[in-house]
Amino acid sequence: MLKNYINMVNIHNFLLYQRFDILYLKKIKLISLLVFTSLIFISTANAKYASFVINENTKRIYHNTNADTRNYPASLTKIMTLYMIFDALKYKKVSMNTKFKISKRATRQPPSKLNLTAGSKITVKNAIFALITKSANDVATVVAENLGKSERNFAKLMTKKAKKLGMTRTIFKNASGLPNRGQLSTARDMATLGMAIRKNHPNFFKLFKTKSFVYKGIKYTNHNNLLGSYSGTDGIKTGYTNASGFNLVASVERNGQRIIGVVFGGKKARSRDKHMIKLLNKYFKTVPSKPLVRIAKPSELPKNRPKLTVVEKNIKNFSIPPKVVNISSSNSLQDDWFI
């Protein structure tokens, strides 16, 4: 009897230690997993930031930080969606007055959106301005479904077009830029896309400087704060999701020279804009200016010249005031979860 009891105690202790060992191993595995996950998160967080500045005229690269690192483009995706619309217009597959049907799926997209009604229609023209200004996700889906039959198929067409344009590290999974782990691009690729639109669709590129758009009595303002506040800015687009941070592709032309700047992973819209301005200011200094017309000295003018007008008398005292940069401090997303 005693021997059996001792055996039972030994078996119990053995099982207890075994259970402890299993729990201990599970704990170690859990800690290891958490550490590994943290390292991945840190790596991903650090990889968010990227920037790229290029002179479109000379193709000279002025700045490159993580320009080929894949990041989430967010609503910069809509630049390609717009490129696809411009292609369709160019090849007369649609016109500005063509009406796109609105599906239930499109209306279910999260903000930023126009709050479209299923079963109704929206013109190509309104779709373009809604994408440029409001960055409407529901409109992006409408465009995809009408031009590509389905958003999934449209995304494949977008990726194919990207490769054709030289965007070698870009993959699209949707037309809006809404969160998708497989939707990736780079700062360099987005600069390539911006230049491609201006080269292949110059008249449509001008639409990117639209500051506001009215649809059904509601005014929507462009998210690109550099428009009207930073001299020479004429496009192109912002993007934001929690995973991507605040992104921006900017186009600025001065003295006949155009610079394209790209920033990925800004912490705030305001700090992203300030950083972009800092990059552009720095590299505009290296851009050669067009020669200015020299004003002749009075001794060089003809003796029998007519008397100077009031305007001519004041030319020598004329100076251009410096451009004051005043970026809007409003960064509230409100109902705009993904812009």
Language-model segments: residues:
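N-terminal secretory targeting signals
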Residues: M1-A50, I54-N57, Y62, S95, ...
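Short secondary-structure boundary micro-motifs
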Residues: L23, V35-L39, A45, T58, ...
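Short alpha-helical segments used as structural interaction elements across diverse proteins
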Residues: Y24-K26, S75, A269-R272
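Solvent-exposed, well-ordered amphipathic alpha-helical segments
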Residues: K26, S43, N64-T65, K90-S95, ...
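A generic structural signal for short, solvent-exposed coil/turn residues
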Residues: S32, L39, A45, K92-V94, ...
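Active-site-adjacent loops and short helices of periplasmic peptidoglycan-processing enzymes
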Residues: A45-R188, M195-K199
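Domain-terminus/edge residues, biased toward the C-terminal soluble/receptor-binding domains
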Residues: M167-I171, P179-L184, R188-I339
